[in-house]
Regions:
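Short acidic, glycine/proline-rich loop/turn micro-motifs
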Residues: 24-28, 108, 164-167, 309-313
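Phosphate-binding site of ATP-dependent enzymes
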Residues: 175-267, 290-295
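C-terminal active-site "lid" helix and adjoining low-complexity regulatory extension at the edge
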Residues: 260, 279, 288-339
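Short, basic/aromatic recognition patches
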Residues: 268-274
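Flexible, glycine/charged-enriched surface loops at secondary-structure junctions
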Residues: 194-196, 279-283, 339
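ATP-binding N-terminal substructure of ATP-dependent carboxylate-amine bond-forming enzymes
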Residues: 1-103, 109-110, 139-145, 331, ...
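Active-site nucleotide/adenylate-binding loops and adjacent lid/helix of ATP-dependent enzymes
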Residues: 2-3, 7-17, 68-70, 112-194, ...
Length: 339
């Protein structure tokens, strides 16, 4: 990019995305898939900035580094989640941006690793005085046992994201089910597994914006149809299969809490946000029991920023999509000012 006099001009902002989220044209430009989160965010950025470019993070990082050096962006909007399908590499991407001394939106390497670790994050949160499920880790090669925790248990990959590998069979009710589920997951993922006590109640989602974060109104997952086969927690299918949600009359809605519960949710969410080193935006997932106990399940350092996530009953309810995107950018600018 050059000025009228031929001098190099810095790009205002670069949208950094996963290679799998679009296609590269013959002229070398990367174009996000239509109706994708990446396209929606890019549209917001181009409405606000004169120069907004897209860079796809390639598994061979040299082309990515060269593209970023050439554009020399004032800030990077980081929407990456993996490298070549490996979600544990999101921290490495943030590390590359740090090494290049490029300001960027979102959580850094330390926070990514903390939040992605479904065991370590619970240990950190428990020290804050927030309730967490009792749990243990089964490493590859470990013997399989419940270690005294009562059934039922939930079994999930330690570093999974987006409910990867979580389905109705993740809920195990005896040692036979536990062994079977561990065997299946070991054949599918090469990582430790977390087994945690199942907390009866409802899923509660709390989004945060900014670095002295505004806590958005909590949202709960509601299953309208009852029955033995009704989902009791959020699975990959529940999140991604519209017909399945229709069949079980599943919806998300704002959760109305009394003043004391609201104070508890706000306080816990802010403390978790900072303890897990989240930045600019994030989401905390809880279970809310019928007795009103708030139990931390996991933190999401880069929750969905598609416009549907800003819907009237979803986590960023009340904030228009362009405003949320701009607030994230401005939070990152303030945090990195002087770099």
């Amino acid at each position: 990019m050059t000025n009228k006099d031929g001098a190099q001009r810095r790009c205002d902002i670069v949208l950094l995305v996963d290679e799998e989220t679009g296609a590269r044209r013959q002229d070398g430009r990367f174009v996000p898939d239509r109706s994708s989160m990446e396209e929606a965010v890019l549209k917001c950025l181009r409405a606000h900035y004169r120069e907004a470019a897209v860079v796809a993070f390639h598994p061979d990082i040299v082309p990515t580094i060269n593209a970023l050096r050439r554009l020399d962006p004032k800030i990077v909007f980081n929407l990456t989640e993996w490298v070549d399908g490996d979600r544990t590499m999101d921290a490495a991407i943030a590390g590359v941006l740090d090494m290049m001394k490029l300001p960027y939106t979102g959580t850094g390497p330390d926070g990514m690793r903390l939040a992605r670790d479904k065991a370590l994050s619970k240990e950190v949160v428990a020290r804050l005085g927030v309730a967490v499920p009792r749990h243990f880790v089964i490493d590859p090669g470990d013997r399989v046992a419940s270690f005294g925790l009562p059934y039922p248990l939930i079994v999930k990959p330690r570093f999974g994201d987006g409910s990867d590998e979580i389905n109705i069979r993740s809920l195990v009710r005896n040692e036979r089910d536990l062994r079977r589920r561990v065997r299946v997951l070991r054949s599918r993922v090469d990582e430790p597994l977390v087994c945690e006590e199942f907390i009866p109640g409802r899923d509660l989602y709390v989004a945060l914006l900014g670095n002295a974060p505004q806590v958005m109104q909590p949202v709960e997952l509601v299953v309208g149809r009852k029955g033995a086969a009704a989902p009791q927690f959020a699975t990959y299918r529940l999140k991604n299969d519209g017909a399945y949600r229709t069949r079980w009359r599943i919806r998300w809605r704002k959760k109305r809490l009394d003043a004391a519960a609201t104070r508890e949710v706000n306080s816990a969410s802010r403390r978790i946000f900072h303890a897990l080193k989240l930045r600019d935006y994030g989401r905390i997932d809880y279970r809310l029991t019928s007795e009103g106990q708030l139990v931390f399940i996991e933190a999401n350092p880069n929750p969905d920023l598609h416009p549907h996530a800003m819907g009237i009953d979803l986590c960023f309810a009340g904030v228009k999509h362009p405003d949320a995107i701009q607030r994230i950018v401005e939070a990152a600018r303030r945090r990195t000012r002087g770099r």
